[in-house]
Swiss-Prot record:
Stated role: Catalyzes the phosphorolysis of diverse nucleosides, yielding D-ribose 1-phosphate and the respective free bases. Can use uridine, adenosine, guanosine, cytidine, thymidine, inosine and xanthosine as substrates. Also catalyzes the reverse reactions.
Protein name: Pyrimidine/purine nucleoside phosphorylase
Organism: Burkholderia vietnamiensis (strain G4 / LMG 22486) (Burkholderia cepacia (strain R1808))
Gene Ontology cellular-component terms listed: cytosol
HAMAP family per UniProt: Nucleos_phosphorylase_PpnP
Length: 106
């Protein structure tokens, strides 16, 4: 069962995904149906990420600004909000307050 605060009956990869000299750290969660998510934290900074698969980023805590590839506008997101990123794309993120997030690979 999945609730708003936890994921049940999953496996977690013990090894952390560490990016950008430790500014972004996450762990991969594997679901029985074969889907996966990452749960992570990004420290205040400005980064550029690339995507392979489409992603849904759900902000659990913190605040960030995001600019998707091909866009000239920044959008601000906080706790309880989410944004989608196309596959085979890039996005800029400026983390204003330490970001706690869940990333779903669609």
């Amino acid at each position: 069962m999945t609730s708003a605060t936890q994921f049940d009956n999953v496996s977690v990869v013990k090894r952390a995904n560490v990016y950008f000299d430790g500014k972004c750290v996450s762990h991969t969660v594997l679901f029985p149906d074969g889907t996966r998510k990452t749960l992570g934290v990004i420290l205040p900074c400005a980064l550029n990420f690339g995507t392979d698969a489409p992603e849904l980023m759900e902000v659990q805590a913190g605040k960030c600004r995001v600019k998707l590839a091909g866009s000239s506008e920044w959008q601000t997101y906080g706790a309880g909000e989410s944004f989608s990123v196309p596959g085979n794309s890039r996005f800029d993120i400026e983390v204003l307050d330490t970001l706690d997030y869940v990333c779903s690979y669609l």
